[in-house]
UniProtKB/Swiss-Prot annotation:
Binding site for ATP: V52, G53, E54, G55, S56, Y57, G58, I59, V60, K75
UniProt KW keywords: ATP-binding, Kinase, Nucleotide-binding, Phosphoprotein, Serine/threonine-protein kinase, Transferase
Name of protein: Cell division control protein 2 homolog 2
Entry-annotated residues carrying Phosphotyrosine: Y57
Activity regulation information from UniProt: Phosphorylation at Ser-56 or Tyr-57 inactivates the enzyme.
Transmembrane stretches, start-end: none
Length: 345
């Protein structure tokens, strides 16, 4: 089943380009059409139940929505206030996120500006992928793994089509709705909204494990390809139940990548020697067969992973292209039908 993109596509070089309108079977839902934003609420609409986490941007609380009665998640983000007040760019960027309405992206329901804090109200999900991986005794395989990755790539493509780059995809930023058997990307767009420098993104060492090599080498372009690399690392982790690359420093992370994929050269990655943190004295490792790292994946799965972990970000497979890969042939039609039902098609 061939599926087309309706209003935007991530090109091979990481740029975005418009495409002609497509037929009814489209990866990009009608939510791409700009929706009017609702007014923000006041803080007393939400009652805190408990603190459930603390991430790159602030504290996360489980809350009760006193208006709707539903359980929601509140991210409380402190803002740097200068003489001009709260930065309008942060509020504007976050407001754009409210237009996202996709079954595989955690929905931003409300934005509340309170004193020097921005309260972001999201749909509440009980568990993240990191927690599920810790609970499981076996890796994800077969149709289950295909469905998870297809859903994540659908969500990723939706956001890239809107020119949002996540920059911090990892298992703890992938939430799970077990009742509906879906996974959802969380925290999309917040890196751009709050201008968080990627090199000092978080004190969590684990974030390094999913970071693209061009970022580790000092590239500041932040193409959508950085998310595809991170998603490839998640893909491998699901298939093997442990991280593919697990360095405890930026240089150790690079060397972990080099030891499996080989030390990149101008022949394998044009322009790599010009990146700020490249060193001509890097150890020279020869690439190993990728299958040795992910023996549970079939040939199609290994091929998809290889394309997601392509060194050159301009040659790395895009989320859109990955969705067309033969690895997903047995689940694509069912998943696209689910997406179309969500869109009311």
């Amino acid at each position: 089943m061939q599926v087309q993109v309706q209003e935007g596509q991530t090109a091979c070089d990481g740029s975005l380009r418009p495409l002609p309108s497509a037929g009814p079977a489209s990866f990009v839902p009608r939510s791409l059409r700009p929706a009017p934003l609702r007014g923000t609420s006041t803080p007393d609409r939400y009652s805190r139940i408990e603190k459930v986490g603390e991430g790159s941007y602030g504290i996360v609380y489980k809350c009760h929505d006193n208006f709707t009665g539903r359980t929601v998640a509140m991210k409380r983000i402190p803002l740097i206030v200068n003489d001009g007040g709260v930065p309008s760019t942060a509020v504007r960027e976050v407001s754009l996120l409210r237009e996202l309405n996709h079954p595989y992206v955690v929905r931003l329901l409300d934005v509340v500006l309170h004193e020097a804090k921005l309260l972001l109200i999201f749909e509440y999900m009980e568990q993240d992928l990191q927690g599920m991986l810790k609970q499981r005794n076996t890796a994800f395989v077969g149709g289950k793994l295909r469905r998870i990755m297809f859903q994540l790539l659908l969500g990723l493509h939706e956001c890239h089509s809107r020119r949002f780059v996540h920059r911090d995809i990892k298992p703890s930023n992938i939430l799970i709705d077990r009742k509906e058997s879906v996974v959802k990307l969380a925290d999309f767009g917040l890196g751009r909204a709050f201008r968080v420098p990627l090199q000092t993104y978080t004190t969590e060492v684990m974030t390094l494990w999913y970071r693209a090599p061009e970022v580790l080498l000092g590239d500041k372009q932040y193409l959508p390809a950085v998310d595809v690399w991170s998603m490839g690392c998640v893909f491998a982790e699901l298939a093997r139940r442990r991280s593919l690359f697990a360095g405890d420093t930026a240089i150790n992370q690079l060397f972990s990548i080099f030891q499996l994929l080989g030390t990149p050269t101008e022949a394998t990655w044009r322009g790599v020697t010009s990146l700020p943190h490249h060193n001509v004295n890097f150890p020279r490792w020869t690439a190993k067969p990728l299958r040795t790292a992910v023996p549970a994946l079939d040939d199609d799965g290994v091929d998809l992973l290889r394309r997601m972990l392509c060194y050159n970000p301009r040659e790395r497979i895009t989320a859109y292209e990955a969705l067309q890969h033969s690895y997903f042939d047995e689940v694509r039609e069912e998943e696209v039908e689910k997406l179309m039902r969500f869109n009311g098609a």
